[in-house]
């Protein structure tokens, strides 16, 4: 889910912090990519329905290969542009996310029921819509994706918990320049730069959104702690929303009161019932100090492609077109041997003014309510990071 409504809010409140870029703008950059999000996008992009029958990309044996096709093609496209992708995979979800995951399971089950109704009615459009809501990336697809990337010589990192948090850790410590994901909570985890729409195909001509956290804070007058509180009020994966608090009210609340505690005390208890499981203190702590492997412990290396391994895996096992795979290997080797010109901005140090924090104000008079935001204890142990198809018919 990420952060509900944050993208629109930032376009309204800090438009200058967001730039529209082409893929080639990131030449020479290391980008930490949320792998699971990318794979999910590749799978749903290749699902469709016609005459009541589902269509998805498979090989001649009927194996779904959407994830491998999309990952191979898009990674090659980035490498062609001189980009150095680093793929980060999700680990164990935090305890705080349990309710959100259960909600997703319930929504997927409901989508399955709606799919069957649409199938009986012969409604291709509704079938496609509901089918995409049931998509889940399988463990097998994750492992196949890791294998493909490693054979291509692209770094793979296994996060101990949330991939966005691990990506943000790499960016904050200078191991990567930006996080590539659709989930806005990459900013909430502290990534200084975030890229959205990185996996959109060139044919759709949708620009990549480059968002700078320091400029967001400077334009809004928020400190990082206040920005995190705003994101929690907007709606995140770790706590339920407070009823009746939309984006504008959340924005005004943090601007006026400076933190969730003071804002909650200002609310009319009769109009805004704070959920008992609104564990905002734990959510805040997780955003500011997530479970990640320290960037200093991660050795990121780009290596030569394993030509024989790629042919064995893609051509012999997954039945990819040999010419396509060989051309891909040639592109990988060309990227390694090509003399890369350094980015001009690498020769300069840019110093920006620190953002100004908004000072908390006294609560409004009126009916008050105290909510300490404490619900559960979050703990975890850090883990070392490690570094010719056709459409099939679903009946």
From Swiss-Prot:
<dbReference type="InterPro" id="IPR036279">
    <property type="entry name" value="5-3_exonuclease_C_sf"/>
</dbReference>
<feature type="binding site">
    <location>
        <position position="90"/>
    </location>
    <ligand>
        <name>Mg(2+) 1</name>
    </ligand>
</feature>
<protein>
    <recommendedName>
        <fullName>Flap endonuclease 1</fullName>
        <ecNumber>3.1.-.-</ecNumber>
    </recommendedName>
</protein>
<feature type="binding site">
    <location>
        <position position="162"/>
    </location>
    <ligand>
        <name>Mg(2+) 1</name>
    </ligand>
</feature>
<comment type="function">
    <text>Structure-specific nuclease with 5'-flap endonuclease and 5'-3' exonuclease activities involved in DNA replication and repair. During DNA replication, cleaves the 5'-overhanging flap structure that is generated by displacement synthesis when DNA polymerase encounters the 5'-end of a downstream Okazaki fragment. It enters the flap from the 5'-end and then tracks to cleave the flap base, leaving a nick for ligation. Also involved in the long patch base excision repair (LP-BER) pathway, by cleaving within the apurinic/apyrimidinic (AP) site-terminated flap.</text>
</comment>
<dbReference type="GO" id="GO:0005739">
    <property type="term" value="C:mitochondrion"/>
</dbReference>
<dbReference type="GO" id="GO:0000287">
    <property type="term" value="F:magnesium ion binding"/>
</dbReference>
<keyword id="KW-0460">Magnesium</keyword>
<feature type="binding site">
    <location>
        <position position="183"/>
    </location>
    <ligand>
        <name>Mg(2+) 2</name>
    </ligand>
</feature>
<comment type="similarity">
    <text>Belongs to the XPG/RAD2 endonuclease family. FEN1 subfamily.</text>
</comment>
<feature type="binding site">
    <location>
        <position position="162"/>
    </location>
    <ligand>
        <name>DNA</name>
    </ligand>
</feature>
<keyword id="KW-0378">Hydrolase</keyword>
<dbReference type="InterPro" id="IPR023426">
    <property type="entry name" value="Flap_endonuc"/>
</dbReference>
<keyword id="KW-0496">Mitochondrion</keyword>
<dbReference type="InterPro" id="IPR006084">
    <property type="entry name" value="XPG/Rad2"/>
</dbReference>
<feature type="region of interest" description="Interaction with PCNA">
    <location>
        <begin position="340"/>
        <end position="348"/>
    </location>
</feature>
<dbReference type="InterPro" id="IPR006086">
    <property type="entry name" value="XPG-I_dom"/>
</dbReference>
<keyword id="KW-0539">Nucleus</keyword>
<keyword id="KW-0540">Nuclease</keyword>
<dbReference type="InterPro" id="IPR008918">
    <property type="entry name" value="HhH2"/>
</dbReference>
<dbReference type="GO" id="GO:0005654">
    <property type="term" value="C:nucleoplasm"/>
</dbReference>
<feature type="binding site">
    <location>
        <position position="185"/>
    </location>
    <ligand>
        <name>Mg(2+) 2</name>
    </ligand>
</feature>
<keyword id="KW-0234">DNA repair</keyword>
<keyword id="KW-0227">DNA damage</keyword>
<keyword id="KW-0269">Exonuclease</keyword>
<comment type="subunit">
    <text>Interacts with PCNA. Three molecules of FEN1 bind to one PCNA trimer with each molecule binding to one PCNA monomer. PCNA stimulates the nuclease activity without altering cleavage specificity.</text>
</comment>
<dbReference type="Pfam" id="PF00867">
    <property type="entry name" value="XPG_I"/>
</dbReference>
<dbReference type="InterPro" id="IPR029060">
    <property type="entry name" value="PIN-like_dom_sf"/>
</dbReference>
<dbReference type="InterPro" id="IPR006085">
    <property type="entry name" value="XPG_DNA_repair_N"/>
</dbReference>
<keyword id="KW-0255">Endonuclease</keyword>
<dbReference type="GO" id="GO:0003677">
    <property type="term" value="F:DNA binding"/>
</dbReference>
<dbReference type="InterPro" id="IPR019974">
    <property type="entry name" value="XPG_CS"/>
</dbReference>
<dbReference type="GO" id="GO:0005730">
    <property type="term" value="C:nucleolus"/>
</dbReference>
<feature type="binding site">
    <location>
        <position position="235"/>
    </location>
    <ligand>
        <name>DNA</name>
    </ligand>
</feature>
<feature type="binding site">
    <location>
        <position position="164"/>
    </location>
    <ligand>
        <name>Mg(2+) 1</name>
    </ligand>
</feature>
<dbReference type="GO" id="GO:0043137">
    <property type="term" value="P:DNA replication, removal of RNA primer"/>
</dbReference>
<dbReference type="GO" id="GO:0008409">
    <property type="term" value="F:5'-3' exonuclease activity"/>
</dbReference>
<feature type="binding site">
    <location>
        <position position="237"/>
    </location>
    <ligand>
        <name>Mg(2+) 2</name>
    </ligand>
</feature>
<feature type="binding site">
    <location>
        <position position="74"/>
    </location>
    <ligand>
        <name>DNA</name>
    </ligand>
</feature>
<dbReference type="Pfam" id="PF00752">
    <property type="entry name" value="XPG_N"/>
</dbReference>
<feature type="binding site">
    <location>
        <position position="34"/>
    </location>
    <ligand>
        <name>Mg(2+) 1</name>
    </ligand>
</feature>
<feature type="binding site">
    <location>
        <position position="237"/>
    </location>
    <ligand>
        <name>DNA</name>
    </ligand>
</feature>
């Amino acid at each position: 889910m990420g952060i509900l409504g944050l993208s629109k809010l930032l376009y309204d409140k800090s438009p200058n912090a967001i730039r529209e870029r082409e893929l080639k703008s990131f030449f020479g950059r290391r980008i930490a990519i949320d792998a699971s999000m990318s794979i999910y996008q590749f799978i749903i992009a290749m699902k469709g329905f016609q005459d009541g029958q589902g269509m998805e990309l498979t090989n001649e044996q009927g194996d779904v290969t959407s994830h491998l096709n999309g990952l191979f093609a898009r990674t090659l496209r980035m490498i062609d542009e001189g980009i150095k992708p680093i793929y980060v995979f999700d680990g164990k979800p935090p305890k705080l996310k349990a309710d959100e995951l259960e909600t997703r399971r319930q929504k997927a089950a409901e989508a399955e029921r709606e799919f069957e109704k649409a199938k009986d009615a012969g409604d291709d459009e509704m079938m496609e819509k509901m089918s995409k809501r049931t998509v889940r990336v399988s463990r097998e697809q994750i492992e196949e994706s890791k294998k493909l990337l490693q054979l291509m010589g692209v770094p793979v990192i296994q996060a101990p918990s949330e991939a966005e948090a691990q990506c943000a850790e790499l960016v904050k410590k200078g191991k990567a320049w930006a996080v590539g994901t659709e989930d806005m909570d990459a900013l909430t985890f502290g990534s200084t730069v975030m890229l959205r729409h990185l996996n959109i195909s060139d044919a759709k001509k949708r620009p990549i959104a480059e968002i700078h956290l320091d400029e967001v804070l400077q334009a809004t007058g928020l400190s990082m702690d206040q920005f995190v509180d705003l994101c929690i009020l907007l709606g995140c994966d770790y706590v339920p929303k407070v009823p009746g608090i939309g984006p504008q009210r959340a924005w005004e609340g943090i601007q006026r009161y400076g933190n969730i505690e003071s804002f909650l005390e200002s609310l009319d208890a009769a109009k805004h019932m704070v959920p008992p499981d609104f564990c905002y203190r734990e959510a805040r702590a997780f955003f500011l100090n997530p479970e990640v492997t320290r960037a200093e412990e991660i050795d990121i290396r780009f290596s030569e492609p394993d030509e024989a391994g790629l042919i064995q895996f893609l051509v012999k096992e997954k039945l990819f077109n040999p010419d396509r795979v060989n051309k891909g290997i040639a592109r990988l080797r060309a990227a390694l041997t090509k003399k890369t010109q350094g980015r001009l901005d690498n020769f300069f140090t840019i110093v920006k003014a620190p953002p100004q924090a908004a000072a908390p104000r006294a609560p409004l008079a009126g009916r008050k309510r105290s909510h300490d935001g404490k619900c559960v204890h979050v703990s975890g142990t850090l883990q070392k990071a490690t570094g010719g198809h056709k459409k099939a018919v679903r009946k």
